[in-house]
Amino acid sequence: MRIGLYPGTFDPVTLGHLDIIRRASTLVDRLVIGVAINRDKGPLFSLEERVAMLEAECAAVSAETGTEIVAHPFENLLIDCARDVGASMIIRGLRAVADFEYEFQMVGMNRRLDDSIETVFLMAEAEHQAIASKLVKEIARLGGDVTPFVTSQVRAALVDRFGPPQMNAAQ
């Protein structure tokens, strides 16, 4: 069984994340979404909320692709999480050159820690390259409409936190 690990904070999960999840699920038999517990980032959504959002959003992808997709919180080293879940590959999405530079360094470190686990990069589709969870939260906080960047469920969760979009936010 081919198991892949797609790690991230997913605060919140975006259409870009879901695109990578959908495409990654065609490469493996089981896709583990590693939900990072990163206390330094101070997430907007709790771990439980992020896991619940991912599980809800991934159910349709799993049904579509036939791949088992599970959310798995982790707080240890990424390579240790990969070992814990039996992953033979770590899947990372790339949006820009800056992402590649960071990921290139991480691959080198992970290979030194365990050279049996490969890293696979999937390029973000053009329409998702500018999407970042940090920017989505900022748009929502400032009263903008996040509809182009997240699903309706995630948009509703952001509206619960920040209120509805303001009509003049884009002006």
UniProtKB/Swiss-Prot annotation:
<feature type="binding site">
    <location>
        <position position="92"/>
    </location>
    <ligand>
        <name>substrate</name>
    </ligand>
</feature>
<comment type="function">
    <text>Reversibly transfers an adenylyl group from ATP to 4'-phosphopantetheine, yielding dephospho-CoA (dPCoA) and pyrophosphate.</text>
</comment>
<feature type="binding site">
    <location>
        <position position="78"/>
    </location>
    <ligand>
        <name>substrate</name>
    </ligand>
</feature>
<dbReference type="GO" id="GO:0004595">
    <property type="term" value="F:pantetheine-phosphate adenylyltransferase activity"/>
</dbReference>
<keyword id="KW-0460">Magnesium</keyword>
<comment type="subunit">
    <text>Homohexamer.</text>
</comment>
<dbReference type="GO" id="GO:0005524">
    <property type="term" value="F:ATP binding"/>
</dbReference>
<dbReference type="Pfam" id="PF01467">
    <property type="entry name" value="CTP_transf_like"/>
</dbReference>
<dbReference type="InterPro" id="IPR004821">
    <property type="entry name" value="Cyt_trans-like"/>
</dbReference>
<keyword id="KW-0808">Transferase</keyword>
<dbReference type="GO" id="GO:0005737">
    <property type="term" value="C:cytoplasm"/>
</dbReference>
<protein>
    <recommendedName>
        <fullName>Phosphopantetheine adenylyltransferase</fullName>
        <ecNumber>2.7.7.3</ecNumber>
    </recommendedName>
</protein>
<feature type="binding site">
    <location>
        <begin position="93"/>
        <end position="95"/>
    </location>
    <ligand>
        <name>ATP</name>
    </ligand>
</feature>
<feature type="site" description="Transition state stabilizer">
    <location>
        <position position="17"/>
    </location>
</feature>
<feature type="binding site">
    <location>
        <position position="9"/>
    </location>
    <ligand>
        <name>substrate</name>
    </ligand>
</feature>
<feature type="binding site">
    <location>
        <position position="41"/>
    </location>
    <ligand>
        <name>substrate</name>
    </ligand>
</feature>
<feature type="binding site">
    <location>
        <position position="17"/>
    </location>
    <ligand>
        <name>ATP</name>
    </ligand>
</feature>
<keyword id="KW-0963">Cytoplasm</keyword>
<comment type="pathway">
    <text>Cofactor biosynthesis; coenzyme A biosynthesis; CoA from (R)-pantothenate: step 4/5.</text>
</comment>
<keyword id="KW-0173">Coenzyme A biosynthesis</keyword>
<feature type="binding site">
    <location>
        <begin position="9"/>
        <end position="10"/>
    </location>
    <ligand>
        <name>ATP</name>
    </ligand>
</feature>
<keyword id="KW-0547">Nucleotide-binding</keyword>
<feature type="binding site">
    <location>
        <position position="103"/>
    </location>
    <ligand>
        <name>ATP</name>
    </ligand>
</feature>
<dbReference type="InterPro" id="IPR014729">
    <property type="entry name" value="Rossmann-like_a/b/a_fold"/>
</dbReference>
<dbReference type="InterPro" id="IPR001980">
    <property type="entry name" value="PPAT"/>
</dbReference>
<dbReference type="GO" id="GO:0015937">
    <property type="term" value="P:coenzyme A biosynthetic process"/>
</dbReference>
<keyword id="KW-0548">Nucleotidyltransferase</keyword>
<comment type="similarity">
    <text>Belongs to the bacterial CoaD family.</text>
</comment>
<keyword id="KW-0067">ATP-binding</keyword>
<feature type="binding site">
    <location>
        <begin position="128"/>
        <end position="134"/>
    </location>
    <ligand>
        <name>ATP</name>
    </ligand>
</feature>
